[in-house]
């Protein structure tokens, strides 16, 4: 995975930083639900690049080219259009570094088999290759199914929250453990539903 800095040039005559931040956070959310960026805590800041005022952010991406427009889904493009209407134009990104603490992304995005897997410690796609257990970027398989990709991220967040609670061992430990270990729990049923839907798409 890679640490990347996207830049949005500010071309609006009037600055409403609150509104502009909300629009850019909408882009961040859609990038995240499409699997183009990983994680939820994304720093957003005003900066200058090549003499142009604008906004930048620091994100973790599964691949060097994750933020290229061809990887966008319809929801990402809509969020980008809303930002552009307010004078925020995506100018591109620079690769800062290879993230040495992150998992390596799967080289084959269409393996013979794959699985859903996550833990409270993981910061990567919950879709893993059956061949080498590497995470597969969601946009590689689900770009045309944004609702499914977002649902998968929400499932991962719920699973990780339960895993964290049972690891902490003080609050809701039994209930959380049941959710991630019982075959007929809500989380397990949701995971099986998602696996079946992903199988249809891939």
Predicted regions and their residues:
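Intrinsic low-complexity, intrinsically disordered or marginally ordered coil/linker segments
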Residues: 1-202
């Amino acid at each position: 995975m890679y640490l990347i800095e996207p830049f949005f040039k500010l071309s609006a005559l009037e600055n409403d930083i609150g509104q502009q931040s909300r629009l850019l956070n909408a882009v961040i959310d859609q990038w995240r639900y499409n699997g183009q960026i990983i994680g939820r805590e994304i720093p957003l800041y005003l900066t200058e690049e090549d003499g142009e005022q604008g906004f930048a952010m620091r994100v973790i991406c599964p691949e060097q080219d994750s933020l290229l427009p061809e990887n966008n889904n319809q929801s990402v493009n809509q969020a980008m259009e809303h930002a552009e209407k307010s004078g925020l134009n995506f100018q591109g990104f620079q690769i800062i570094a290879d993230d040495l603490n992150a998992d390596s992304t799967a080289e084959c995005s269409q393996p013979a088999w794959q699985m859903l897997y996550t833990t409270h410690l993981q910061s990567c796609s919950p879709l893993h290759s059956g061949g080498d257990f590497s995470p597969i970027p969601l946009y590689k398989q689900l770009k045309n199914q944004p609702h499914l990709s977002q649902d998968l991220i929400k499932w991962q967040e719920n699973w990780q929250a339960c895993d964290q609670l049972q690891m902490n061992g003080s609050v809701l430990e039994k209930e959380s453990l049941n959710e991630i270990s019982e075959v007929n729990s809500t989380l397990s049923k949701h995971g099986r539903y998602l696996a079946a839907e992903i199988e249809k798409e891939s």
